[in-house]
Amino acid sequence: MSFQKNEYSHKNVSEDNNGQGGNPPIASPLNDQQFNSLQQTVSELSSQQLAWVSGYFWGLAQHQPSAAATPIAQAAAAVSAKPAGKLTIIFASQTGNAKGVAEALEQEAKAEGIAVELFDASDYKGKNLAKETHVIIVASTNGEGEAPDNAIELHEFLQSKKAPKLSNLQYGVIALGDSSYEFFCQTGKDFDTYLAKLGATSFIERIDCDVDYEAAAEEWRKNALGKVKETLSSGNEAEIVQLPVGQAAASHSQYNKQNPYTATLLTSQKITGRDSGKDVRHIEIDLDGSGLTYQPGDALGVWYENSSELASDILGKVGLSGVETVDVDGESLSIHSALVSKFEITTSNPQLVAKFAELSGSKKLQKLAEDKDKLREYSANTQIVDVFAEKKTKLTADELVGLLRRLTPRLYSIASSQAEVDEEVHLTVGLVEYDHNDEKRYGGASSFLAQRLEEGGDVKVFVEHNNNFKLPEDDTTPIIMVGPGTGIAPFRSFIQERENRDAEGKNWLFFGDRTFTQDFLYQVEWQKYLKSGVLSRLDVAFSRDQVEKVYVQHRILENAAQVWQWIQDGAYIYVCGDATRMAKDVHDALVIVAEQEGKMPRDDAEQFINDLRKAKRYQRDVY
């Protein structure tokens, strides 16, 4: 089904470090009154506040015209006679986790006085590795073992014949992933392998971090920076200058993943029909006074609480009353409270199943644990409460939390533009619900937002910026958007933004779902945008409205000639939604379009589409 435009069917800060490098001490530029005032203020701050304030001062210093005459500049001049040794940090990130770890590493390196540069993998030229002495790569893994979109080019370069010998390079790799997937931390493992093959030396063992990565990543960063300081000093490549506390880098916002903003739920409205098999909610959250800003393509992180009833059900399965206490981050909590607010109690994982098989003695689970594929399939389709139901087992409170991962926030693609909604943020949330042995099962975050959180209630949120899913800078550039189901969310943001910017570029949307009458999300809005001309074209695919199922990839192929023409006209392509099937099918459809309409062999068509990704003209936000 297709719709065209306008139609619709004070001391010397270095006096204790004089032995480090033999540099002259850096004199304090503060008078006694300034220094005493600073000391009094600093003494009242927490460590988190100190980190923020130090970065704030550093940011101010960087923008002062007289910065060249500051003690930092003097310190730099004192070591400039020697070759500049530095640490280069490269992040390969899809959703922002690896970027966050890399930014934390950068801040910590600066606080240690280490010269450091931070690069998005898409902005780093692989050949420059031959000029580096110390590199740390922070890499997440996308989909089924694929490199994140921003790292595809670097990942391919290191496998190519053009990759240089790296015998002078020392490196470290921190890999992020989810052990529920077969190719756990694959991208990080790849980078480790490729660098070693090119002759580089690892100065610290690679760490493979699971979804609750924060503590492990923090410890690894500490150890890695210690080794970097040792090797930089021993190699005499550069002297480590211990900078004043004010030189630590600033965080981008007062509110972040570790320090979320307590916002208010304004609206939770079901936008699927009463006879739909889905419950999809339009969520509006008030950010007034937070100072939080976002761009189209960004995500909102939501810290949610688990169902109290589910926590009680789990406790009953393992013989606990709920009043037993556990220690979580130095805080003593009842086990029931801990399950509600601190631990993941919905989604299972292979490690949990294997450990419970051992504790319970369940023959069924022990047999599953011997087959990785079957174990992975079972854990993906069985919630924790149902794993524990396999065999009644008495656990202590500490044994129970030893099986569980820490609770992590859920990221949702933002469905609004601040140019349109100001200090609000909108989401499109599909409630995850299904039956298991005649029992209703729900997703943790989606049921919190759609069922348990009432309008006017508090929700802790933060903005996760996504530089890998951004509108073209040139407003005349055409865009093609493919977003079935809740994958429509960022494109609502895109269209709102393009309308408010009076962007002249054409906009083409492919949307799909089950039925036209029950599942056409934001239907009235798309009608309005078609009528006004903001939306140039809309093609929809409702899979259950006819005998033969039709999906968005079929609509792309039906319009192959026009899609190819838009690509030739410079269009950017965006895909959002399911990674397991939809994204792959859409990718294959685009390759077929290039093959047929571009009159090129299949291999060349594949390369053409991959080149679009490298040029950031083909961007994906898939999950």
From Swiss-Prot:
FMN binds at residues 93-98, 140-143, 176-185. Its EC number is 1.8.1.2. Pathway: Sulfur metabolism; hydrogen sulfide biosynthesis; hydrogen sulfide from sulfite (NADPH route): step 1/1. Binds 1 FAD per subunit. Binds 1 FMN per subunit. Keywords: Amino-acid biosynthesis, Cysteine biosynthesis, Electron transport, FAD, Flavoprotein, FMN, NADP, Oxidoreductase, Transport. It catalyses: hydrogen sulfide + 3 NADP(+) + 3 H2O = sulfite + 3 NADPH + 4 H(+). NADP(+) binds at residues 543-544, 549-553, 585. Gene3D superfamilies: 3.40.50.360, NADPH-cytochrome p450 Reductase, Chain A, domain 3 (1.20.990.10), Nucleotide-binding domain of ferredoxin-NADP reductase (FNR) module (3.40.50.80), Translation factors (2.40.30.10). The keyword Oxidoreductase applies. InterPro entries: CysJ, CysJ-like_FAD-binding, CysJ_Proteobact, FAD-bd_FR_type, Flavdoxin-like, Flavodoxin/NO_synth, Flavoprot_Pyr_Nucl_cyt_Rdtase, Flavoprotein-like_sf. FAD binds at residues 346, 380, 410-413, 428-430, 434, 443-446, 623. The keyword tRNA processing does not apply. GO terms for molecular function: flavin adenine dinucleotide binding; FMN binding; sulfite reductase (NADPH) activity. Residues 1-32 are annotated as: Disordered. Alpha(8)-beta(8). The alpha component is a flavoprotein, the beta component is a hemoprotein. Belongs to the NADPH-dependent sulphite reductase flavoprotein subunit CysJ family. In the N-terminal section; belongs to the flavodoxin family. Component of the sulfite reductase complex that catalyzes the 6-electron reduction of sulfite to sulfide. This is one of several activities required for the biosynthesis of L-cysteine from sulfate. The flavoprotein component catalyzes the electron flow from NADPH -> FAD -> FMN to the hemoprotein component. This is Sulfite reductase [NADPH] flavoprotein alpha-component. It comes from Vibrio parahaemolyticus serotype O3:K6 (strain RIMD 2210633). The lineage of its organism: Bacteria, Pseudomonadati, Pseudomonadota, Gammaproteobacteria, Vibrionales.
